[in-house]
Amino acid sequence: MRFAGMSCDDERPANMFDLMAPQLASTSCNEHYFSTADLGASTLYATTTDAPATIAGILTPQPATLAPMYSTCPVRFDDQRSAPASTSVSGKRKHSDVEKDRRRSISNGFAVLQNVLHNESNAKPISKSILLQQACDEIRELRKKLDASTTIISRFGLENLFVPTPSSTHASPPNASSRIYSPINQASDVLADTRRASISTSATPILYSEEKRKANAKRRHSYDGSWQASDRGSIDDEASASASASASASSSASCSSSSHTHSDDTDCDDTDTDIPAESALKERTKRHKARSKKERDRTKPRYRPKPSTNRSPTPSSCASSTPNSPPTSSNRNRDLQQAILSLLLELPSHLEDVKNKRRASQPTELADPSSVKSRSKKRHR
């Protein structure tokens, strides 16, 4: 069997077509070539409308190519030249989307600015130039307030008070070295520190001395005669403690004086020092017993609050000096913003106080005595 594309003299094995048939059938082309053994010749018929190839055309001595046979099967491949065009179009679309998003964000920003300046959610739209002008005016007002605060600080000479100490317990922010300590920043830091100190001191109760605490604990037991007994016992305890302290002090003084004056005397006699201490104790108990029951009830507090169980033994000064937890950088920034806002809000009242103090320091005319009396009566009422 001979194939198209081969010369007449070339011989190939008979199963060569069987090897190539599945490859031709597996292509996307619907046209298959097959040999007909009934004709007894090597003619090739096609299922297409093309005319069958003649035997003379096949038996020509010139070598025929396989191009006519494969030209009927269209080759399908992806056009690589159309890819750059699609990418450029998508790039243009992306650029337009970015531009739209940018314009939308700008319009949204102006809408937010309008709501902030006018405090109205359903306000009429205002032109961008007017909004920008109003924002600039607000910034100028804030600058004026800041300048006024700096002048107040410089006028009263408060710059030295706002100098930051290196031994501060608060954690410094990461950009503390690059921060410029202007009077405003220093004032805000001081306000934040005082606010933290007030919070820490308000959480801790006021602590009395140990003697007062014991006396109050004894007085809280009951409201009848047992209170008097406990009161008397506490007073006697205090008197005995003070007497023993005075006796020890006087004995030490007498010992030192005797050692200076009489070096030969080795013993120090304490009998003389005990007499005035005992007499003072007796006088104090007599005076306490001489008081009538009404006077003792009068000094008794009417309202006795219950003792708080969560009283910490640390004094309030220590609690106020150290905060509960070291603030982080975010907390410090938030406190700084709050301090600046509070400083700006307190400026008008502070200015009024300064004006009132100046007016009060100047000599003014005496007011009408009748009006002063009426005011005092109203206050007493």
From Swiss-Prot:
Region annotation (Basic motif) maps to 90-103
* Localisation: Nucleus
Keyword flag NADP? no
Which residues fall in a compositionally biased region of kind Acidic residues?
266-275
Which stretches does the entry tag as region Disordered?
A: 81-103, 212-337, 353-381
Q: List the InterPro entries hit by this protein, alphabetically.
A: bHLH_dom, HLH_DNA-bd_sf
Q: Which UniProt keywords apply?
A: Nucleus, Transcription, Transcription regulation
Q: Which GO terms describe its molecular function?
A: protein dimerization activity
Output compositional bias ranges, type Basic residues.
284-293
Where primarily located?
Answer: nucleus
**Domain of life of the organism encoding this protein:** Eukaryota
**Region of interest called Helix-loop-helix motif, as start-end residue ranges on this chain:** 104-142
User: Is-annotated flag, keyword Transcription?
Assistant: yes
Q: Which spans does this entry mark as compositional bias, Low complexity?
A: 240-260, 310-331
Q: Which intervals hold domain bHLH?
A: 90-142
Mutant phenotype after disruption = Abolishes the production of itaconic acid.
**Pfam families under this entry?**
HLH (PF00010)
Q: What does this protein do?
A: Transcription factor that specifically regulates the expression of the gene cluster that mediates the biosynthesis of itaconic acid and 2-hydroxyparaconate.
This chain's protein is named Regulator of itaconic acid biosynthesis
